[in-house]
């Protein structure tokens, strides 16, 4: 629904993201809370679909604060760290009775430009947040699951 997200619920969701594990506990995540109509309008410029959510979390990381794995070509932890943070926030949202949708079909540079996000922050995804409508049902994409036999191999 378009009902505003309670500040108390939003703070619990953000806290779940803050305490989520990150590589070497570097905590490179940066979360931008988009609630004002003006900010939502700027964010929507990049969306193919209007989610009509009362709140969005633009999720990224400070590229200067990520851990680099020297055993794997200095691979950066940022995308993984932010994915863990987003997952923790989604789980908390669901626990509080909110729906959350991971929006990955974005143009990160355009989101950064439209919202004046600093150059040293890499935007990974946007999370929409809102309370479920009473008639909400999962889409077909969310009800079809593969079996563990297909996905897991015991060694």
Language-model features and meaning:
Residues 1-155:
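Acidic, surface-exposed loops and disordered segments
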